Amino acid sequence: MKSDIHVCAVWESEHDRPVYTLDDTCPECGAEAVNSAPAPFSPEDSYGEYRRSLKRRSRE
């Protein structure tokens, strides 16, 4: 799911704290703002299959 909230991509080097915005650019430094929500899972997750199977077993 894509979030409407963005965070400055260079906040660690340019700001003291994360700068959040609804725009595509940072309001303080003008740098690109990126999606602040993490991905729900990684396709390269090598242990994801095992975690999901354990979760399925615990539901049964």
Curated annotation (Swiss-Prot):
GO CC annotation terms, alphabetical: ribonucleoprotein complex
Domain of life: Archaea
GO biological process: pseudouridine synthesis; rRNA processing
UniProt keyword annotations, A-Z: Ribonucleoprotein, Ribosome biogenesis, rRNA processing
GO molecular function list: snoRNA binding
Renumbered residue ranges of the record's region Disordered: 36-60
Keyword Ribonucleoprotein: yes
InterPro entries: H/ACA_rnp_Nop10, H/ACA_rnp_Nop10_sf, Nop10_arc-typ
Cross-referenced HAMAP family: Nop10
Family: Belongs to the NOP10 family.
NCBIfam families named in the record: PRK13130.1 (NF009623)
UniProt function note: Involved in ribosome biogenesis; more specifically in 18S rRNA pseudouridylation and in cleavage of pre-rRNA.
The protein's name: Ribosome biogenesis protein Nop10
